[in-house]
Amino acid sequence: MEASITRRVRSSAPSSGSFIHTNTLTENLADIQEKDRFDVVLANPPFGGQERKEVQQNFPIRTGETAFLFLQHFIKILRAGGRGGIVIKNTFLSNTDNASVSLRKMLLESCNLHTVLDCPGGTFQGAGVKTVVILFEKGAKTRKVWFYQLDPGRNLGKTNPLNDEDLAEFVKLQKTFANSPKSWSVDAKTIDPATFDLSVKNPNGGEAIAHRSPQDIIDEIAALDAHSAEVLQTIKGLV
């Protein structure tokens, strides 16, 4: 199954492209040079992991949180004017530990964090936490952050994933950073310099919480069980 996915990724890559298999976090940020930088970084880094002390030594903001180390790496490898689109757990926006506060400060002061897409639960299967997508451009400081609270009007899950239609309004409004019942802007001057808190606080009525129905949860569990059974059957056939 993993080999099949790898083949599909390789077949979809441009002939001029290349793949590098390495542990990104073992690279010291101080060693990254201009020739190592990129114009665009799109990523969904793993979060919830705990990195070893020797790995943390490679970063100016030391933390065991895997996703926070990756975010520092992404900012570093972008060229001036480079664009980033990163999926990260939503608690990054409000955590009060020193690493989270320092990382938000770094992001706001070294990049233009222009968009925060607040995703509903179930958007990314297996994440276990709510997520946001942060869109930024490296170089100029952040002057204004535009938030959009995604609400597809239904519960998301493995059998009912997010689709292009769900994102249509976001794509339309984001072009001009327009305000709406689901979107608003926050002036960087109003962000608390002590915490750099970026919590999603919709001034038009607060955060909508979509509760999944019991049947939806049962259906997803059944689908996951069926998938697990298929994987186990495949493994048995290899033994």
Regions found by a protein language model. Give the residues of each.
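S-adenosyl-L-methionine
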Residues: M1-K35
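A conserved structural/catalytic subdomain of Rossmann-like adenosyl-cofactor enzymes
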Residues: H21, T26-V239
